[in-house]
UniProtKB/Swiss-Prot annotation:
Domain of life: Bacteria
Name of the protein in question: Formate-dependent phosphoribosylglycinamide formyltransferase
ATP-grasp domain location: 120-315
Family, as annotated: Belongs to the PurK/PurT family.
Pathway recorded for this protein: Purine metabolism; IMP biosynthesis via de novo pathway; N(2)-formyl-N(1)-(5-phospho-D-ribosyl)glycinamide from N(1)-(5-phospho-D-ribosyl)glycinamide (formate route): step 1/1
Keywords attached to this entry: ATP-binding, Ligase, Magnesium, Metal-binding, Nucleotide-binding, Purine biosynthesis
Species annotation: Variovorax paradoxus (strain S110)
Enzyme class: ligase
Cysteines engaged in disulfide bonds, as pairs: none
Family annotation (InterPro entries): ATP-grasp (IPR011761), ATP-grasp_carboxylate-amine (IPR003135), ATP_grasp_subdomain_1 (IPR013815), PreATP-grasp_dom_sf (IPR016185), PurT (IPR005862), PurT/PurK_preATP-grasp (IPR054350), PurT_C (IPR048740), Rudment_hybrid_motif (IPR011054)
E.C. number: 6.3.1.21
Taxonomic classification: Bacteria, Pseudomonadati, Pseudomonadota, Betaproteobacteria, Burkholderiales
Length: 400
């Protein structure tokens, strides 16, 4: 039986989130509803999750000594990475020394912090289908990889980046230099490394939210949410919907791939597994060992949304991945470059049938920064997508 304490008392169950953006904020709220004391960590002050947590801490999470000092000072029960830009070797060191338990595991955090670790695990160790790929350290290596068999069109991504930053499509030789420069500008490490992938002419792409949680006997079991369809622009999520229809054979393959990858990563929690689908064929793309941006739709569609599932799973509590209603989400962009912006049209957005919105509270807006999301439940996903985009379009961010 799992025992939970009382926040701000000696009995408290204390959870530290490394990364406190909009996804982390919802995880923190889910944890607090279960009586957990929360510590929100980010690289800048007043991050969305810091606005709702019991404690807010601001450090450079990629600095191993800062990270170690904070964990040793706060003594959390669990450390939950919510972003990739973390000193994961230090997390591994602290977990190995018995200082803290990392969710899902320190190894999973390390392997998924960059595209190389997880791609080599999936394709070379586990043998799951992926697009053809090469890793390159220079423009010359990139061109050689394309010429040697990757071919055109292809996709180039920094090995370390988030939210589609630095990702582009190469249609021919004239695009190679531009794609390399864009990847270098968008990566989290200067003079970085890229992955170039052969283009898969897929029918659609999905996120399969996969949950590793304990059953009544205490054994970890794998459960799946209904597939989530989504549209990405330059690798960044724009809208998502659930459920996305899939042929039974394709769904079975998707679940087999997701279970193989997440079982190897181990631990407990929710994973966002991204997959390409063409007919009955399925290819693994990426995995995040945490709630996924496309999964925000579950706040409108599931009895327990992805954040509640993650919170329950990491605490050893029962989970329910079942669907409540079809639904969709659509991103609300900042529209302006400013701090402390205002939002007009909120009432108009909420007049859309079945709608809800989340405004993330990010202190600084950029024209294409995700500042909120519209959520809609409806009788079918087509209706939900139309209404979600309508609701999102009614919110008008502006300089205050």
């Amino acid at each position: 039986m799992t025992t939970l304490g009382t926040p701000l008392s000696p009995s408290a169950t204390r959870v530290m989130l490394l990364g406190s953006g909009e996804l982390g904020k919802e995880v923190l709220i889910a944890l607090q509803r279960l009586g957990v004391e929360t510590i929100a960590v980010d690289r800048y002050e007043n991050a969305p999750g810091q606005q709702v947590a019991h404690h807010a801490r601001t450090i450079t999470m990629s600095d191993p000594e800062q990270l170690k000092a904070l964990i040793e000072a706060e003594k959390p029960t669990l450390v939950v990475p919510e972003i990739e830009a973390i000193a994961t070797p230090m997390l591994q060191q602290l977990e190995d020394a018995g200082v803290v338990r990392v969710i899902p595991t320190a190894r999973a955090a390390r392997l998924t912090m960059d595209r190389e670790g997880i791609r080599r695990l999936a394709a070379e160790t586990l043998g799951v289908p992926t697009s053809p790929y090469k890793f390159c350290d220079s423009l010359a290596e990139l061109q050689a990889a394309i010429d040697a068999g990757i071919g055109y069109p292809c996709i180039v991504k920094p090995v370390m980046s988030s939210s589609g930053k630095g990702q582009s499509k190469i249609d021919g030789p004239a695009d190679v230099q531009k794609a390399w420069d864009y990847a270098m500008a968008g990566g989290r490490v200067s003079h970085g490394r890229v992955i170039v992938e052969g283009f898969i002419d897929f029918d659609y792409e999905i996120t399969l939210l996969t949950v590793r949680a304990k059953d009544a006997a205490g054994a970890v079991q794998t459960r799946f949410c209904e597939p989530i369809g989504h549209v990405q622009v330059s690798g960044d999520y724009v809208e998502s919907w659930q459920p996305h229809p899939m042929a039974p054979a394709a769904l079975q393959k998707a679940q087999q791939i997701a279970e193989a990858v997440t079982s190897d990563l181990g631990g407990q929690g929710l994973f966002g597994v991204e997959l390409f689908v063409k007919g009955d064929e399925v290819w693994f793309s990426e995995v995040s060992p945490r709630p996924h941006d496309t999964g925000m739709v579950t706040m409108a569609t599931q009895w327990q949304n992805e954040f509640e599932l993650h919170a329950r799973a990491i605490l050893g509590l029962p989970v329910d991945t079942s669907l409540k209603s079809p639904g969709a989400s659509a991103v609300i962009y900042g529209g302006v470059d400013a701090t402390g912006i205002a939002f007009d049209g909120v009432a108009e957005a909420l007049r859309v049938p079945g709608s809800d919105i989340r405004l993330f509270g990010k202190p600084e807006s950029f024209a294409k920064r995700r500042m909120g999301v519209a959520l809609v439940h409806a009788a079918d996903t087509g209706t939900a997508r139309r209404l979600a985009k309508d609701a999102a379009s009614r919110v008008k961010p502006r300089k205050a």
